[in-house]
């Protein structure tokens, strides 16, 4: 067996002797991963997590983890002939993801719950479940690449920049990366994924991509937070940078850093933007666009994926991404500890918000060096 050539998942044994748990959301991406591996002869076990039940509100296009998605994942497993299990993770998901999401909004931050879900649920509890099932590895439908480097597995951006999910996976640890596989990361486009789904005759080949956070139907964050934290939408003042009252708002949870529309304070001359939220005073602070400009970004809870320790240098030249929709920009990391740093953006960015992630990339390379969470004090 030791002389057997490496299979496509990197193991020196036949596919039939390699068990792989596939995390199946019911969407086309993870379905294609499962189908491709099953077709190659791997011992595939499909697992779908029941994360959140929002009743009928979630049974719609654009939401994930609904009953329909579980049904779709099961149909794919039946089509390809491998076992499929549904695990109830609702309590875990609420404690690890939803509660923090609500509390972060109440504190004036703009959280990214999908990162926490990967970090605390999918790549922690589900990964452990895969090991308990005697799997050799766990595969997902994420668009990201795992490449072997001189020091072990490395995390790299997807070949398709438009689909790259590295921003949401920066917290993947080296130990998790050793067990994970991302079979779609090398594909050039989503069209290739759908073509593979059609080739396998999968019932989800034309299923729309999910858009909403699974527990936020219609993208209405404020409505969900009000249900989770009654009284969260208390009204308060909209003030300018000098403290002058300009109007009244409907509750801090309705606003995000950089927001311009929907403030209800028109007719004041130059456009005004939300530059800060003060939940304790129930104030939304607005100012001109230049007030959004940020160069110094404090980052904590850093997951560092570089070969040398973060604190082995006083400075690291990197490319940094402060929002999922923005391109990485030149930056300098100045470590304060193994898990905290000050990040200086060479060119200032607008709308840097507490609660978002700051993800680090190697200059001139596709490698992800890690990242952390932006917290108060960005300037």
Swiss-Prot record:
GO BP annotation list: tRNA wobble position uridine thiolation
Site (Interaction with tRNA): 142, 356
Molecular-function annotations in GO: ATP binding; tRNA binding; tRNA-uridine 2-sulfurtransferase activity
Main subcellular localisation: cytoplasm
Documented EC number(s): 2.8.1.13
Lineage: superkingdom: Bacteria
Record's catalysed reaction(s): S-sulfanyl-L-cysteinyl-[protein] + uridine(34) in tRNA + AH2 + ATP = 2-thiouridine(34) in tRNA + L-cysteinyl-[protein] + A + AMP + diphosphate + H(+)
Keyword Disulfide bond among record annotations: yes
Subcellular location: Cytoplasm
InterPro entries: MnmA-like, MnmA-like_C, MnmA-like_central, MnmA-like_central_sf, Rossmann-like_a/b/a_fold
Disulfide bonds: 117-214
GO cellular component: cytoplasm
EC class (word): transferase
The entry's keywords: ATP-binding, Cytoplasm, Disulfide bond, Nucleotide-binding, RNA-binding, Transferase, tRNA processing, tRNA-binding
Region spans: Interaction with tRNA: 163-165
Enzyme active site: 117, 214
Sites where the protein binds ATP: 23-30, 49, 141
HAMAP family recorded: tRNA_thiouridyl_MnmA (MF_00144)
Role: Catalyzes the 2-thiolation of uridine at the wobble position (U34) of tRNA, leading to the formation of s(2)U34.
NCBIfam families (alphabetical): PRK00143.1 (NF001138), trmU (TIGR00420)
Family: Belongs to the MnmA/TRMU family.
Listed name of the protein: tRNA-specific 2-thiouridylase MnmA
Protein's organism: Cereibacter sphaeroides (strain ATCC 17029 / ATH 2.4.9) (Rhodobacter sphaeroides)
Classification lineage: Bacteria, Pseudomonadati, Pseudomonadota, Alphaproteobacteria, Rhodobacterales
């Amino acid at each position: 067996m030791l002389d057997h050539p490496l299979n496509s998942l990197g193991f020196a044994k036949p596919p039939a002797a390699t068990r792989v748990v596939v995390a199946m959301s019911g969407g086309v991406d993870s379905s294609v991963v499962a189908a491709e591996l099953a077709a190659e002869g791997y011992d595939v076990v499909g697992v779908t997590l029941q994360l959140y039940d929002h009743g009928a509100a979630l049974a719609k296009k654009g939401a994930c983890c609904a009953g329909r998605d579980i049904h779709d994942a099961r149909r794919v497993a039946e089509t390809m002939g491998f076992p499929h299990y549904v695990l109830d993770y609702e309590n875990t998901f609420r404690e690890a993801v939803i509660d923090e999401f609500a509390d972060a909004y109440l504190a004036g931050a703009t959280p990214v719950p999908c990162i926490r879900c990967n970090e605390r649920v999918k790549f922690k509890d589900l990964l452990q479940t895969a090991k308990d099932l005697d799997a050799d590895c766990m595969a997902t439908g994420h668009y990201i690449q795992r490449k072997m480097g001189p020091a072990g597995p490395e995390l790299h951006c997807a070949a398709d920049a438009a689909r790259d999910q590295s921003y949401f996976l920066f917290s993947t640890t080296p130990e998790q990366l050793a067990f994970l596989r991302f079979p779609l990361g090398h594909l050039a486009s989503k069209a290739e994924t759908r073509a593979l789904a059609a080739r396998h005759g999968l019932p989800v080949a034309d299923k729309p991509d999910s858009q909403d956070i699974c527990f936020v139907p219609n993208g209405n964050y404020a409505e969900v937070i009000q249900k989770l934290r009654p009284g969260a939408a208390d009204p308060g003042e909209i003030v300018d940078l000098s403290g002058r009252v300009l109007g009244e708002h409907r509750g801090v949870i309705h606003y995000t850093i950089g927001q311009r529309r929907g403030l209800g304070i028109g007719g004041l001359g130059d456009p005004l933007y939300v530059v800060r939220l003060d939940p304790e005073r129930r104030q939304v602070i607005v100012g001109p666009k230049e007030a959004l400009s940020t160069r110094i970004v404090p980052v904590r809870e850093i997951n560092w994926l570089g070969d040398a320790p973060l604190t082995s240098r006083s400075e690291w030249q990197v490319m940094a991404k402060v929002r999922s929709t923005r391109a990485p920009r030149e930056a300098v990391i100045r470590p304060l500890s193994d898990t905290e740093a000050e990040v200086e953006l060479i060119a200032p960015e607008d709308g840097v918000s507490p609660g978002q992630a700051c993800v680090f990339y190697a200059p001139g390379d596709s490698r992800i060096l890690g990242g952390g969470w932006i917290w108060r004090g960005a300037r």
